[in-house]
From Swiss-Prot:
Subunit structure: Homodimer.
Compartments it resides in: Cytoplasm
Any GO CC annotation of this UniProt entry: cytoplasm
Region (B): 346-562
Organism: Shewanella putrefaciens (strain CN-32 / ATCC BAA-453)
Name recorded for this polypeptide: Chaperone protein HtpG
One family name in Pfam for this protein: HSP90
InterPro entries membership: HATPase_C_sf, Heat_shock_protein_90_CS, HSP90_C, Hsp90_fam, Hsp90_N, Ribosomal_Su5_D2-typ_SF
Renumbered residue ranges of the record's region C: 563-637
Length: 637
């Protein structure tokens, strides 16, 4: 036996242990679900490794998990004969959290137990859940294929450190013993443990066993002798792959527990789909839409994808090749009959079978969401609030399904008068005015900025609905979604307003007349502003505001410029088109000014006001304030 070594826990582990004990106390029994789930994973991993090295079974290929309790000692032991761990593996897996984005996770914690317990659940506590009920945890483990004297003993009281030493262990696998706190001794009871296993672990494909005591010989009711029975390890769960069972035999509770097993989520899934596909490719998929977004959904390093099985043998986690990135929130598994057992991520990458399965699974998920949107709008809004921004990546990523994805998108709109994104493109089309051929939208920094934009004035007056977009991804989305059901999406802040048949002949004639009469004013403003603008025009979109700026048809929008600047990208200089409203009193007064210096100052002030309204900021706010103060002083004399 080697000398004992003491190691300090990683800082994040200390924080997690403290939080778990204080935040997960209301659902203590989940410790058993987590530890049994880990044990089943260890069995799956050994089964996979043994495909290429049968010697790892060491003559014992019957994989299982065994649970036992000792009331007198106040202990619970979970033992598996799976893959086991080496000394380095123990230090790595039981002393650190090897996850990207860990620091970000701890920033998200609020100190409110109910919210934090949900976050911790999403993070996946796994092994550390043992400390919810245990004052001390002892782990004895030996990696498959290693010598008996290369086993490891790990021990900790869940405070600041743990000890590790080399021991001898005849059998491979891992044995975890929980020394229960005095107030948690209820878990050292066979019946209590059986009820938890039935509740949480029925779906696990590895047998979960508990010791069934034998009975002595006894007399029957008619005096006959009933022979003694020997004690044995009794299987407590169904121990068959849930996804291979008939759908009609699986309860909603079983589906939900299986979801929690594969996702390590503590909340129920929003919906799921269980299907067997036959034909050119044969595979089974079980797909879940979570009810809550994971805390690290936007972390670029976050692993995502489905669990991959081949002929019921677990192959890998996070097989992202079967799911496009914009559906990365989907959890579940795929079990293929066509892929080879020695399949690797590299083989999956350019495999025609993989591509066909990916196409089928993508359509399946989109179908699930379409059905949800149609059958339960309220539940769909719940989905949208969690994952809508990710789904908006779809039109850029998946050209083949662009129209279907577009039908699932939701936006705020001038029709509802609410910031809630509840309007679909189909809703919009159903309310289009007679003669309307375009879907009008605006992208701004916030809902209020979009809803109150002067660019909407004429459209509001005519009762034409405008979609209000204010998420960072909206500008990216709209660059890849230019039409829907043969209706062009048209920005109200870019180029001409293009009302087409919505503008009658009299209005058009009046607009042309106004432009003609205002031509001298427009030329004066152009001269005053010089190179600050690309052009100056009489507006066709304003009714109550003196002026606005618009982007040219082929130029980069204000929102796209902001996105690129935020990402540190070089941005080309874009000069706006300045539109003025000659019917507004300010512009009318401007036309009467004879002093060209004063005229230039007022023209600049109107331009900067319009830019402030459009961008929310100015390149040189000090110059704007100085000019405004100067104008105020001049008019107070």
């Amino acid at each position: 036996m080697s000398q004992q070594e003491t190691h300090g826990f990683q800082t994040e582990v200390k924080q997690l242990l403290h939080l778990m004990i204080h935040s997960l106390y209301s659902n203590k029994e989940i410790f058993l679900r987590e530890l049994v789930s880990n044990a089943a994973d260890a069995a799956d991993k050994l089964r996979y490794l043994a495909l290429t090295n049968d010697a790892l079974y060491e003559g014992d290929g019957e994989l299982r998990v065994r649970i036992s309790a000792d009331k007198d000692k106040g202990t619970v032991t979970i033992e598996d004969n799976g893959v086991g761990m080496t000394r380095d593996g123990v230090i790595e897996h039981l002393g650190t959290i090897a996850k990207s984005g860990t620091a970000e996770f701890f920033k998200n914690l609020s100190g409110e137990a109910s919210k934090d317990s949900q976050l911790i659940g999403q993070f996946g506590v796994g092994f550390y859940s043992a400390f919810i009920v245990a004052k001390k945890v002892t782990v004895r483990t030996r990696a498959a294929g290693h010598k008996a004297d290369e086993a490891v003993l790990w021990e900790s009281e869940g405070e600041g450190s743990f000890t590790v030493e080399t021991i001898t262990k005849a059998s491979r696998g891992t044995e975890i013993t929980l020394h229960l706190r005095d107030e948690e001794k209820e878990f050292a009871d066979d019946w209590r443990l059986r009820s938890i296993i039935t509740k949480y672990s029925d779906h696990i494909s590895v047998p979960v066993e508990m010791w069934q005591e034998g009975t002595p010989e006894r007399d029957g009711p008619d005096g006959e002798k009933i022979p003694a029975t020997e004690g044995y390890w009794k299987v407590m769960n169904k121990a068959t792959a849930l996804w291979m069972r008939n759908k009609s035999e699986i309860s909603d509770e079983e589906y939900q527990e299986f979801y929690k097993h594969i996702s390590h989520d503590y909340t129920d899934a929003l919906l799921w789909s269980h299907n067997r596909v036959e034909g050119k490719q044969e595979y089974t998929n079980l797909l879940y839409i979570p009810s809550k977004a994971p805390w690290d959904l936007w972390n670029r390093d976050r692993k995502h994808g489905l669990k991959l099985f081949v002929q019921r043998v677990f192959i890998m986690d996070d097989a992202e090749q079967f799911m496009p990135s914009y559906l990365r929130f989907v959890q579940g598994l795929i079990d293929s009959n066509d892929l080879p057992l020695n399949v690797s991520r590299e083989i999956l990458q350019d495999n025609h079978i993989t591509k066909a399965m990916r196409t089928g699974i993508t359509k399946r998920v989109l179908g699930m969401l379409e059905k949800l949107a149609k059958d339960d709008a309220e539940k769909y809004q719940q989905f949208w609030a969690e994952f809508g921004q990710v789904l908006k990546e779809g039109p850029a990523e998946d050209f083949a399904n662009r129209e279907r994805i577009a039908g699932l998108l939701r936006f705020a709109s001038t029709h509802t008068g609410s910031a809630a994104p509840t309007v679909s493109l189909d809703d919009y089309i159903s309310r289009m005015k007679e003669g309307q051929t375009k879907i009008y939208y605006i992208v701004a920094d916030s809902y209020d900025a979009a809803a109150n934009s002067p660019h909407l004035e004429l459209l509001r007056k005519k009762g034409i609905e405008v979609l209000l977009m204010s998420e960072r991804i909206d500008e990216w989305l709209i660059n890849h979604l230019t039409e829907y059901k043969e209706k062009q999406l048209h920005s109200v802040t870019r180029g001409e307003l293009e009302l087409g048949e919505l503008e009658d002949a009299a209005e058009k004639e009046a607009q042309e007349k106004l432009a003609e009469e205002s031509a001298p004013l427009i030329e004066r403003i152009k001269a005053a502003l010089g190179t600050k603008v690309a052009d100056v025009k009489v507006t066709s979109r304003l009714t109550d505001t003196p002026a606005c700026v618009v982007t040219g048809e082929g130029e980069m929008s204000t929102q796209m410029i902001k996105l690129m600047q935020a990402a540190g990208q070089p941005v080309p200089e874009v000069k706006p088109t300045f539109e003025v409203n000659p019917a507004h009193p300010l512009v009318s007064r401007l036309n009467d000014l004879q002093d060209e210096t004063a005229f230039a100052d007022w023209s600049n002030l109107l331009l900067q006001q319009a830019q402030l309204s459009e961008k929310g900021s100015l390149a040189d706010p000090s110059a704007f304030i100085k000019l405004m103060n100067q104008m105020l002083l001049a008019n107070m004399k």
